[in-house]
């Protein structure tokens, strides 16, 4: 059994990091491994380390932990580097969004057709894209045999950028494909009898194959839409897989949008809050409305505070068990949800659903498994350039990643009217980043339906570049 070093960048993300640690503990083939946690927020880093060590102690696993605030330390001697960091955090994203809205760009300039996800900035996110490249180059220099696992948004732009510019082993991961299981559950189907396949780009994947008991399962979905869709109500802002927006997109494109693809629709569904409510449901109007995103940010803030609270309690009460947290927490909904998450990771028979650790296990121990991965196209999806990263199912084993044949192929409408326009925006973002040509960002905004004048474009870009966090970005774009 190989013991490996796994580095996690942005380890202050509480739930994600704990899920990875729990999956490691439930993977015998990775016993004895070292996990290096890296974050620039030392308080959050210490909290995660405290809880992770308690978890490992409680389940009796053989894992070693290191912590660092230095990027080199997390990469040196690493076999796998998982990046989930967001440079500037949500504070920076909100600053840019507010500037955009000040000049008439509802939900900010990075909210673009087919890319409406509120933390998926591509044009004003120079610092994030540069960080991806910096990490990749350090891997090339310090641990050239290591795998780079991209988990931080924007995964589409980020993984494409890294695979084009730095010769390392890189793959991107998301969990939007689990939207298929939501459909399966809603239709009352037995999961083991479902044959499914998705294909597209990150946050732009489509259910090209949907079969049940050997037959086409789409008529079952059509029946549900006809008989039950009118009664659909969202349970939370992210609950949109069977929303009116998803169904409307399905009717136009011919196959079902999956996961965050539903959020990444056209302006028809996103013009304003009332429009969002119509298509994504009351009361939030989806995850990316001003109401839905505030719900998400508030939830994140509560999770961070709960994590610190739990870590403090563990330090003060070393004999406490994580399974007893319900007696400490559980006072409000967020704390109850945190307790439920802990109960899930304590279940020895249950993996988290994150793909990263099973992927590592498949590569190292030849435990063959199916994953949905973000990798360069290389002919997988017809009509898309080879060096564009696509999101597709693949078998992974000790010999690497083996993408499935996309069968049946994606409909022409998906490729021509959805994927190619989305890819064009990715290409514009990457060319702007790589060349420093500010005219590309201006051109994007000239085409934006929210733009009413050239002056509007000049002013919004000028104010975004003037942010203190964007000093390097400003120099990069104004050097020409």
Curated annotation (Swiss-Prot):
PROSITE patterns: GLYCOSYL_HYDROL_F4 (PS01324). Its EC number is 3.2.1.20. Its cofactor is NAD(+); Mn(2+); Co(2+); Ni(2+). Pfam families: Glyco_hydro_4 (PF02056), Glyco_hydro_4C (PF11975). Optimum pH is 7.5. Active from pH 6.5 to 9. Inhibited by Hg(2+) ion and EDTA. Homodimer. SUPFAM superfamilies: LDH C-terminal domain-like (SSF56327), NAD(P)-binding Rossmann-fold domains (SSF51735). Coiled coil: none annotated. Mn(2+) binds at residues 174, 203. Binds 1 NAD(+) per subunit. It is an enzyme of class 3 (hydrolase). Alpha-glycosidase with a very broad specificity. Hydrolyzes maltose and other small maltooligosaccharides but is inactive against the polymeric substrate starch. Does not cleave beta-glycosidic bonds. This is Alpha-glucosidase. It comes from Thermotoga maritima (strain ATCC 43589 / DSM 3109 / JCM 10099 / NBRC 100826 / MSB8). Substrate binds at residues 119, 153. NAD(+) binds at residues 4-70. GO terms for molecular function: alpha-1,4-glucosidase activity; hydrolase activity, hydrolyzing O-glycosyl compounds; metal ion binding; oxidoreductase activity, acting on the CH-OH group of donors, NAD or NADP as acceptor. NCBIfam families: alpha_gluc_AglA (NF041089). The lineage of its organism: Bacteria, Thermotogati, Thermotogota, Thermotogae, Thermotogales. It catalyses: Hydrolysis of terminal, non-reducing (1->4)-linked alpha-D-glucose residues with release of alpha-D-glucose.
């Amino acid at each position: 059994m190989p013991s490996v070093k796994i580095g996690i960048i942005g380890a202050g993300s509480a739930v994600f990091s704990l899920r990875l640690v729990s999956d490691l503990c439930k993977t015998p083939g990775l016993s004895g491994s070292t996990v290096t946690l890296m974050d620039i927020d030392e308080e959050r880093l210490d909290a995660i380390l405290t809880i992770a060590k308690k978890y490992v102690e409680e389940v009796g696993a053989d894992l070693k932990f290191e912590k660092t605030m230095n990027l080199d330390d997390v990469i040196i001697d690493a076999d796998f580097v998982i990046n989930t960091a967001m440079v500037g955090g949500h504070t920076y994203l909100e600053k840019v969004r507010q500037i955009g809205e000040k000049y008439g760009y509802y939900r900010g300039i990075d909210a673009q057709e087919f890319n409406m996800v509120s933390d998926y900035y591509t044009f004003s996110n120079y610092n994030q894209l540069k960080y991806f490249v910096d990490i990749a180059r350090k891997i090339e220099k310090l641990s050239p045999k290591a795998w780079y696992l991209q988990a931080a948004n924007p995964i589409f732009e980020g993984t494409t950028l890294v695979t084009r510019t730095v010769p390392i082993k890189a793959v991107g991961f998301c969990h939007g494909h689990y939207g298929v299981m939501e459909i399966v559950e809603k239709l009352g189907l037995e999961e083991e009898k479902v044959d499914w396949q998705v294909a597209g780009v990150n946050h732009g994947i489509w259910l090209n194959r949907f079969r049940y008991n050997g037959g086409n399962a789409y008529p079952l979905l059509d029946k549900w839409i006809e008989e039950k869709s009118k009664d659909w109500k969202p349970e939370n802002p992210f609950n949109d897989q069977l929303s009116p927006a998803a169904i409307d997109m399905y009717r136009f494109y011919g196959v079902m949008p999956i996961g965050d693809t539903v959020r990444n629709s056209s302006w028809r569904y996103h013009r304003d809050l009332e429009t969002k409510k119509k298509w994504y449901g009351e009361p939030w109007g989806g995850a990316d409305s001003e109401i839905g995103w505030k719900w998400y940010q508030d939830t994140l803030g509560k999770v961070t505070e709960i994590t610190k609270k739990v870590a403090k309690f563990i330090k003060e009460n070393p004999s406490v068990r994580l399974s007893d947290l319900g007696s400490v927490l559980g006072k409000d909904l967020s704390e109850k949800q945190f307790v439920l998450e802990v109960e899930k990771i304590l279940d020895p028979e249950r993996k988290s659903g994150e793909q990263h650790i099973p992927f590592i296990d498949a590569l190292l121990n030849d435990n063959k498994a199916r994953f949905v991965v973000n990798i360069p196209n290389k002919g997988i999806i017809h009509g898309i350039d080879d060096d564009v990263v696509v999101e597709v199912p693949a078998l992974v084993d000790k010999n690497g990643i083996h993408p499935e044949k996309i069968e049946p192929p994606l409909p022409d409408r998906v490729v021509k009217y959805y994927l190619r326009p989305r890819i064009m925006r990715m290409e514009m973002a990457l060319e702007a980043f790589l060349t420093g040509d500010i005219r590309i960002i201006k051109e994007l905004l000239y085409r934006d339906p929210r733009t009413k004048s050239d002056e509007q474009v000049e002013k919004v870009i000028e104010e975004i570049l003037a942010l203190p966090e964007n000093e390097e970005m400003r120099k990069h774009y104004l050097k020409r």
